[in-house]
Amino acid sequence: MSLNFLEFEKPIAELEAKIEALRDVSRHGGDSAIDLDKEIEQLEKKSLELKKKIFSDLGAWETAQLARHPQRPYTLDYVKHVFEEFDELAGDRAYADDKAIVAGIARLEGRPVMIIGHQKGRETREKVKRNFGMPKPEGYRKALRLMKMAERFQMPIITFIDTAGAYPGVGAEERGQSEAIATNLKEMAGLTVPVICNVVGEGGSGGALAIGVGDYVNMLQYSTYSVISPEGCASILWRDSDKAPQAAEAMGLVASRLKELELIDEIIEEPLGGAHRNHVQMAANMKATLLRQLAELEQFPQDVLLERRYQRLMNYGYC
């Protein structure tokens, strides 16, 4: 899969294009290939140093672009690389099955867990099928149905958050979008099993919060979490969506800032260049975090688990 480079990555893209061109010559150049090995090695070293330099000083706007990268791993990618024996479950038993939310039972190192997450889709047909990762009320009701199932069978719940927001269409509002989100917030706060939430891309407003109440809330290094998109914020405050970079900086939507505010618990490191550059390494980092946090949470008696979660929520808003 060829990588899509973002605007701020152009110097890296140019270097990697040169490296690939030299590799191509090396593969088909006969004896002259020997002379190219050293040059390729030097360029690879230069590319690595450039990546480290660029990614050591990313602004909020660059991070927001990375969070939306079309090749970033989605929920089903984590299902593939982190879990075993995944069985997808469908439908809210009231209206329909929303494909923007994927959910099901799987095993994590042999342990049964319930997985729930947003799914955006990559190709045009799949994006439409998944509604670009923007769930409707039936998606959140499906999620709640399966959370309750997990509670009955004492299975930990793991959620993957990656949405621009809940779908704002007329039909979704008529079917009770706000009620579905509010009900999930209330019910998740009282679940008697461990709940670990992971923001893996965009954490957009109530659409993210609806599967984001848990004992641990983690964010990937280059993910975002906010009440509105930078473009939306800029359109409201400055009547100009081109001011999105300024809005992103002002909103404090990046993982490091949210960790300072104690709105999230842990930042999961991404491979150099972002999660999209190495799905397998990103999944390994995710798996290690989940195993460690689950081992800790499973030691707590039920009443302690609920009290811990309650105190965590009550601390929101205090500096």
Swiss-Prot record:
Location of the CoA carboxyltransferase C-terminal domain: 35-296
Chief place where the protein resides: cytoplasm
Membrane-spanning ranges: none
Gene Ontology biological-process entries: fatty acid biosynthetic process; malonyl-CoA biosynthetic process
GO MF, one example: ATP binding
An annotated GO cellular component: acetyl-CoA carboxylase complex
Catalytic activity: N(6)-carboxybiotinyl-L-lysyl-[protein] + acetyl-CoA = N(6)-biotinyl-L-lysyl-[protein] + malonyl-CoA
EC class name: transferase
Pathway: Lipid metabolism; malonyl-CoA biosynthesis; malonyl-CoA from acetyl-CoA: step 1/1
Keyword annotations: ATP-binding, Cytoplasm, Fatty acid biosynthesis, Fatty acid metabolism, Lipid biosynthesis, Lipid metabolism, Nucleotide-binding, Transferase
Disulfide bridge positions per record: none
Source domain of life: Bacteria
PANTHER family, sorted: ACETYL-COENZYME A CARBOXYLASE CARBOXYL TRANSFERASE SUBUNIT ALPHA, ACETYL-COENZYME A CARBOXYLASE CARBOXYL TRANSFERASE SUBUNIT ALPHA, CHLOROPLASTIC
Function: Component of the acetyl coenzyme A carboxylase (ACC) complex. First, biotin carboxylase catalyzes the carboxylation of biotin on its carrier protein (BCCP) and then the CO(2) group is transferred by the carboxyltransferase to acetyl-CoA to form malonyl-CoA.
NCBIfam families referenced in this protein's UniProt entry, alphabetically: accA (TIGR00513), AccA_sub (NF041504), PRK05724.1 (NF004344)
Official protein name in the record: Acetyl-coenzyme A carboxylase carboxyl transferase subunit alpha
Organism lineage string: Bacteria, Pseudomonadati, Pseudomonadota, Gammaproteobacteria, Vibrionales
